[in-house]
C-alpha cells in the first residue's frame, strides 16, 4: 500500500514528537529540514531523500520554507530499508522513480516501487550535510570559515568583505543554504569538531580551535546539534553519519 503527500511548510515549521504506522520516504525540493529522533539530529538538505521507519518517534523543524513530497509505505514494503532513520544521496534514476511514484494519484506501478527500493538499498547514506551557497562572494566566505572555523568575525564584517549590505548578505545566505548565517557557522564547527573528536583531540582544545571562549559554550552547541556531548560522541562505536 502506497500513499503520497505534498509537503509545503512555511519558515519556522515545527512538529511535535510523533510516529507513523507507515514508513515515510520524503524528498525536499527546496529548504532545509532538521529531523530529531532518538538517535539525535540530522540535517536533511534539499535534493536528498529522507527515511523514517514505521513507528519511529521523531520531530521535524525548519527555519526556511519547505517544499517537497512524501511517500508512505505499508510496513510490509519496508523490509529492505534501514530500521533507523536515514538520509540517502540519490542518483538521477532514483530521483526519477521517486517523482513518478509521488505523482501517482490513484494507482502506482509496483515495479517502479520495487526498483526504487532496490536503488535506495545501495544508495550512499549521508548525514550532517552542510549546504554551500551558489553566489561566488558567499562561497568565498564559506571557504574561509571552513578553513578557519575559529573565525569569530561578525556577520557585518563578512557582509562588508563580500561587498554586500548585511540585509542582502543575510537574505542571500538564507535563500541559498536554507539556514541563517549563525546556524550555518555552528554546524560547520560541529562537523569539524566531529572530525577532531574522531582523531582523539581533547575537548578543551577543540572548543578553543572552534572559536568558543569556554568549553561549556562549545558543549552546549554540540549537544544542540547532535543530542550528545562531545565526550559521549567520542566513545560511540560507529561515527554518526556513517551508518
Whereabouts are the PLM-identified features?
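N-terminal regulatory/effector-sensing and dimerization cores
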Residues: 1-87
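Terminal helix-turn-helix DNA-binding modules in bacterial transcription factors
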Residues: 152, 156, 175-219, 235-243
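Short hydrophobic/aromatic patch on the recognition helix
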Residues: 47, 169, 173, 217-218, ...
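Short, Lys/Arg-enriched anionic-surface-contact patches
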Residues: 128-137, 171, 177-186
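Basic, amphipathic alpha-helical hairpins
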Residues: 101-105, 119-126, 140-157, 173, ...
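Helix-turn-helix
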Residues: 159-163
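Amphipathic alpha-helical segments enriched in hydrophobic/aromatic residues interleaved with Lys/Arg
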Residues: 78-146
